[in-house]
Each structure stands twice: as C-alpha cells, then as structure tokens.
C-alpha cells in the first residue's frame, strides 16, 4: 500500500534524529544496496559533502546513503556518523580488503532558529547522524523532525516533507525535502500553497488555489541573510538510471522548488537536489521516458516541500516562527 513517501520506492529507508534542546537534527536516506545518483546545485550558498563524485564523469558509481542535516557547516559531520553505522553493517565501496561507505550530504542553516548551540568542543551531528541511520525505516515522521527540526521559511515554520507518484508506465518516483527557504511556500499572507495545483488527496490541507490572487502575492519577501537558508531534497525512482540520467532528473526536479517556493534559487539560498535510480529495469525510452520521469519528479518534489510546511510544528523557544497550523488551524 502506498505511503505517499519516498519510501514507496523499494530499497529506500529514511531515518530522523533530532535534539529538542539543540533545536536541530539530521535526516538520512539509506539505500538497502548501492545506487546510482547525481546532484544539481542551484542556490547561491550551498554546503555539501562528496557531491563531486556524483558528477557523471567521476568513477564511483554507487552510493550508500544521503544525509540532510541542520547545523550549517557543522552539520557536515553527520555523514561521518552515518558512515560509521554503515561500516558496522559491512557496507561500502570495496578497495581490496577495505570498505568505504559513500555518503554524500548537504546542510541547512538553523543556528539562529532557537535552541542551545553551545555544544562544547565538538558539534553533536556525528552522533545524530549515527542515530538517524540506525532509525531508518519505510515509515517516518514529517514536519519538525530530523533536518527539519530547526527549519524555517520567510513567514512560517519549515520542516521535512515527502510524497510519491507513478508514471504512466508504473515507475515510482518519490521525494523528500527539508524546507528551510528564504522564500515563502504560501501565496502572500493567505493559507494557500504555491504548490496547490499539484496536490493529491488533500495532503497539505486541500486549500486549493485562492479565488483571486491577493495584491501581495508576487511581492518579494525573504528571510535572513546570505548563508541562512536552503531547501534540500532527494528524489528517487525504481527505474535503473545512469549517472547522466540521474543528473538530468535532478536538474528537472529543481523545477519543483520553483513551483512550491517564491522566490527561490536566490543568492540567499543553498538549494540542492539529489536524484537516485534504484531499480534494475532500464527506462523503455531513454529520452521520452526520462522526460516524463523528470517532470513527475518536479511535481512530487513541489508536493513534498508544501507537506513539510503543512506538517511542521513551532519550536518552543521565544520568538520561534509560527507553524502553518498555528496561523490557519
């Protein structure tokens, strides 16, 4: 039975770990076996790890997990915790007798969203990464969890969202996003989401499109300063993809951000989209089937971003950003 989560793609597991006192956390996408993946970076201030090897020209073909973390650059440590867990499972790229788990990742800035960030000498993200990997399952929570725990947007609390769909040929596409954008996911000051045209089964409230656009709908609104914002996402499919095909899916999926966030891809953001092909069946047509797959990936990602905001709950700290439910019920 479909969960409307990225884990509807067989072989994908997701784990979240967070620290309420810290106001930050980690989300890990674990693949049950190595997968082909690539990445597309559009934001002006990204923070990433091991994304260079996802270029189609590079040698390593399979990755074991992808990490999305809070904590800004400190959160890059989370991938080391995930590596440690994978190593315990005997996973990783084999070089003679050695195995090295391949774990790309990306981070978002939540250092000023509230919480106690005075963690001492070493940040806690390595342990949070390990715990998130250990918790990885087909079922997982949405909203203010994992990398979405401290996430915010221009006007509302952000969070972790996910969604899935199938192509006409029955290929499954799933997405997960940590919404921490400089822009807004809602139209002006209304309850309506920019992603409303793509919504399925009232998954983010069924509010639809406003009867008329409010006067402030297209007004520029933004949160924070350069380096403080980003939307991180992973799209996955049960089709077999080459690295070049995964790259094209990641590029096309970035349109999902444009459909769900206004404004987006600004110098203030660090937007990153990973794409992974998990199946053993190649696309029936390398051009048209890939075009449909990438188009659907954008739709699914737009839905996941809106769900992340819809499912979020406000943090308990003074001055914390209100959630969608706080404002609109």
Language-model features: locations:
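A structural signal for small-residue-enriched, beta-sheet-centric alpha/beta enzyme cores
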Residues: 1-73, 77-80, 87-329
């Amino acid at each position: 039975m479909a969960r409307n989560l990225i884990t509807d793609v067989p072989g994908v597991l997701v784990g979240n770990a967070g620290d309420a006192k810290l106001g930050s956390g980690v989300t890990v996408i674990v693949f049950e076996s190595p997968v082909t993946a690539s990445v597309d970076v559009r934001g002006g201030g990204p923070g990433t790890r091991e994304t260079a090897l996802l270029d189609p020209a590079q040698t390593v073909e399979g990755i074991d997990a992808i990490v999305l973390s809070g904590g800004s650059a400190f959160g890059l440590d989370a991938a080391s915790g995930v590596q440690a867990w994978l190593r315990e499972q005997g996973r990783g790229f084999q070089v003679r007798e050695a195995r090295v788990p391949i774990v790309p990742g990306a981070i978002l800035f939540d250092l000023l969203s509230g919480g106690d960030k005075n963690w001492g000498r070493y940040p806690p993200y390595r342990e949070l990464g390990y715990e998130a990997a250990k918790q990885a399952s087909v079922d997982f929570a949405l909203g203010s969890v994992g990398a979405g725990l401290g996430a915010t947007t221009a006007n509302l609390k952000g969070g972790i969202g996910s969604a899935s769909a199938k192509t006409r040929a029955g290929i499954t596409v799933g997405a997960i996003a940590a919404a921490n954008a400089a822009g807004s996911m809602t139209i002006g000051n209304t309850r309506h989401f920019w992603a409303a045209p793509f919504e399925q089964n009232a998954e983010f409230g069924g509010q639809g499109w406003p009867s008329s656009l409010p006067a402030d709908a297209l007004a520029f609104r933004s949160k924070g300063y350069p380096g403080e914002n980003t939307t991180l996402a992973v799209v996955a499919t049960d089709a077999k993809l080459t690295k070049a095909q995964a790259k094209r899916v990641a590029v096309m999926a970035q349109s999902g951000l444009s459909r769900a966030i206004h404004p987006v891809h600004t110098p203030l953001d660090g937007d990153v989209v990973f794409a992974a092909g998990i199946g053993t069946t190649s696309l029936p047509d390398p051009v048209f089937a890939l075009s449909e797959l990438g188009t659907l990936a954008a739709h699914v990602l737009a839905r996941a971003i809106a769900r992340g905001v819809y499912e979020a709950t406000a943090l308990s700290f003074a001055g914390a950003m209100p959630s969608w439910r706080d404002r609109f019920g």
